[in-house]
Design a protein with these regions (language model features):
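Acidic, proline/glycine-enriched N-terminal capping motif
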Residues: 1-115
Length: 115
C-alpha cells in the first residue's frame, strides 16, 4: 500500500524507535486494545474545535500499529482487537500518546513526539 501522506512513514519509524525504548522483551502476542491520542498542529484560525481535517484517523492508526509491530512491542498488528482514537489540537508539542492494553490486563504507555 502506498502512503498518500509523505510524513506517515517517518511517524511509523519514530513510533517503532519509541516502542523499542519502552519494551525490551518479546513482542506481545495476544489480543490488545490501543488508546491513541494524536496531537496535531493548531491552525491560526481553526474552523472547528477539533482537527477534523486532512490527516485521516484510520491512516494515523495504521501508522502507529505498524510502528508498534516494527518496533517489536506487538507480534502482529492484527492482535489489536479494539482501538480508541482521538485527534486533538496540540497546545504545545505535536505527537501521539499511545497506550497498549493487554485485553483484560495491564497497559504499556508510549508518549511519542516527533523530533
Amino acid at each position: 500500500m502506498v502512503e498518500t501522506n509523505k510524513n506517515l512513514p517517518a511517524w511509523r519509524k519514530a513510533i517503532a524507535a519509541a516502542a523499542r525504548e519502552v519494551h525490551k522483551g518479546e513482542p506481545i502476542d495476544e489480543p490488545l486494545i490501543t488508546r491513541l491520542d494524536f496531537y496535531l498542529p493548531k491552525p491560526k484560525k481553526p474552523r472547528w474545535l477539533v482537527p477534523a481535517t486532512a490527516l485521516d484517523i484510520d491512516k494515523l492508526e495504521r501508522a502507529v500499529n505498524d510502528g508498534l509491530q516494527d518496533g517489536g512491542l506487538i507480534k502482529n498488528d492484527s492482535r489489536v482487537v479494539q482501538s480508541i482514537s482521538e485527534k486533538h489540537y496540540a497546545e504545545e508539542r505535536t505527537g501521539c500518546q499511545v497506550t497498549v492494553f493487554r485485553h483484560g490486563a495491564t497497559a504499556v504507555h508510549i508518549d511519542f513526539q516527533p523530533r
